[in-house]
């Protein structure tokens, strides 16, 4: 079973949690896109859902495949969000934001009664941090914000490169007009402390640590998909 087949298995298992009539947050990334494709097949057969996309990229795919969409302002309370992750630990703490949609992903997840994370087994880790932590920042005062992040990291015993994410034509810009600093801290022993410290920096719009948000993680491997509940 290759990586895409594992993503499809995880998406299939998540789809079993979606009931007709649900208000559904729809994530961003390659695994979430497999979920959208499967959801679209059910919608074509008469399955009723209303989706709130977490990125313009996801919105375009939903429109292309016929998944009905609303804005979060139109549906401010959601039943369920299904989204991918870059890393998942045993407590279902996550690193997200590799696709650049972390702010909207977190807003949509927070507006949902439940969040289900779907991923292949390569994303399951004992401790977060092998994947660089995306930190969404305001373009104004970028150097000052970067220095503040470095100071926070030093206080917590973390170090590593802080790289401003690039795209083909310069700095990567999120759907909200912000930039992303990818922080290669390595192992993050206290994700809660780092989350709190980053939240205190005025120039930090959001970060990719999702803590106490996921209710379930569906992890797919060669033997199929398994469901993990938070070990908190």
Curated annotation (Swiss-Prot):
It catalyses: aldehydo-D-ribose 5-phosphate = D-ribulose 5-phosphate. One of its GO terms (molecular function) is ribose-5-phosphate isomerase activity. This is Ribose-5-phosphate isomerase A. It comes from Rhizobium etli (strain ATCC 51251 / DSM 11541 / JCM 21823 / NBRC 15573 / CFN 42). InterPro entries: NagB/RpiA_transferase-like, Ribose-5P_isomerase, Ribose5P_isomerase_typA_subgr, Ribose5P_isomerase_type_A. GO terms for biological process: pentose-phosphate shunt, non-oxidative branch. Its EC number is 5.3.1.6. The gene is rpiA. Belongs to the ribose 5-phosphate isomerase family. Catalyzes the reversible conversion of ribose-5-phosphate to ribulose 5-phosphate. Pathway: Carbohydrate degradation; pentose phosphate pathway; D-ribose 5-phosphate from D-ribulose 5-phosphate (non-oxidative stage): step 1/1. It is an enzyme of class 5 (isomerase).
């Amino acid at each position: 079973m290759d990586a895409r087949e594992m993503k499809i298995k995880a998406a299939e298992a998540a789809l079993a949690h979606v009931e007709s009539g649900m208000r559904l947050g729809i994530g961003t990334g390659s695994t979430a896109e497999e979920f959208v494709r499967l959801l679209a097949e059910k919608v074509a057969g008469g399955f009723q859902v209303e989706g709130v996309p977490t990125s313009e990229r996801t919105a375009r795919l939903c429109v292309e495949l016929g998944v009905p969409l609303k804005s979060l302002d139109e549906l401010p309370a959601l039943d369920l969000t299904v989204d991918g992750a870059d890393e998942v630990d045993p407590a279902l703490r996550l690193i997200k934001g590799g696709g650049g949609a972390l702010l909207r992903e977190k807003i949509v997840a927070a507006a949902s009664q439940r969040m289900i994370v779907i991923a292949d087994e390569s994303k399951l880790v004992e401790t977060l941090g092998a994947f660089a932590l995306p930190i969404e920042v305001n373009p104004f005062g970028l150097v000052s914000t970067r220095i503040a992040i470095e100071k926070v990291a030093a206080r917590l015993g973390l170090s590593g490169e802080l790289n401003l994410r690039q795209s083909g034509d310069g700095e990567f810009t999120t759907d909200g007009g912000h930039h992303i600093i990818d922080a290669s801290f390595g192992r993050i022993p206290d994700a809660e402390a780092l989350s709190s410290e980053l939240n205190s920096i005025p120039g930090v719009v959001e970060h990719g640590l999702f803590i106490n948000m996921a209710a379930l993680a569906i992890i797919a491997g060669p033997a199929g998909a398994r469901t993990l509940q938070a070990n908190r």
